């Protein structure tokens, strides 16, 4: 892996981590197109650039997080189910990382997005929960529980939490905001655990540190831009376009990767 690859993959991570399109699927496809093998170095690189994306959320919502203790309680409630199931099922989760799984889950998730949005349109429903302050502890727990589905590659953490948020009565924008914020404890924990499990690989590849940092920085900058634009988009439009995109990408996976 060189600096150009690091920049490209960092951009891909920043673009897709918080969109409901599966960053894992895009990273696998991008690595394939760049001719990169799934080596231990690439796995460590993915951990670092994911950290860059998380820091973008912290930076974006820092003032809100600093002032709203009640929000932290909701995030903790949402994080607990994922933490428990993720810790217990860590070894089994890694066995799901197959291109075929990613492809099928992309398509299934896309169909679900379209169905949910069309259903909401039919009954003229846009969500009763219009602000983060109105999100209840029960809603936070259910949305957090849905993150467990995102342990299956291709599902998308943001995708599963946003869909569940919509089904729980959150507006499109609030569902997206809560999904972003819930990523902070969830992704920090996942990144820390992966780093711990792969500590020896990091030590063995210290010469790649600058490449890791370049990728992480690119992911941070791009994620900041994407979060701002995405929130503006969902305040005006539905998630149907993302559902269609997922189905197209999943089909490309089935044709190209498999």
From Swiss-Prot:
This protein's record includes keyword Cell division: no
Keyword presence, Transmembrane helix: yes
InterPro entries given in the database record: UppP (IPR003824)
Transmembrane regions listed in the UniProt entry: 1-21, 42-62, 69-89, 96-116, 135-155, 173-193, 211-231, 237-257
Broad EC category: hydrolase
Entry-linked Pfam families: BacA
GO biological process: cell wall organization; peptidoglycan biosynthetic process; regulation of cell shape; response to antibiotic
UniProt GO cellular component terms: plasma membrane
Catalytic activity reported: di-trans,octa-cis-undecaprenyl diphosphate + H2O = di-trans,octa-cis-undecaprenyl phosphate + phosphate + H(+)
Enzyme Commission number(s) from the entry: 3.6.1.27
Keywords recorded for this protein, A-Z: Antibiotic resistance, Cell inner membrane, Cell membrane, Cell shape, Cell wall biogenesis/degradation, Hydrolase, Membrane, Peptidoglycan synthesis, Transmembrane, Transmembrane helix
Membrane disposition: Multi-pass membrane protein
Intrachain disulfide bonds: none
Location in or out of the cell: Cell inner membrane
GO molecular function, one term: undecaprenyl-diphosphatase activity
Stated family: Belongs to the UppP family.
Function: Catalyzes the dephosphorylation of undecaprenyl diphosphate (UPP). Confers resistance to bacitracin.
Note in the entry: Bacitracin is thought to be involved in the inhibition of peptidoglycan synthesis by sequestering undecaprenyl diphosphate, thereby reducing the pool of lipid carrier available.
Protein's name according to its UniProt entry: Undecaprenyl-diphosphatase
Organism: Campylobacter fetus subsp. fetus (strain 82-40)
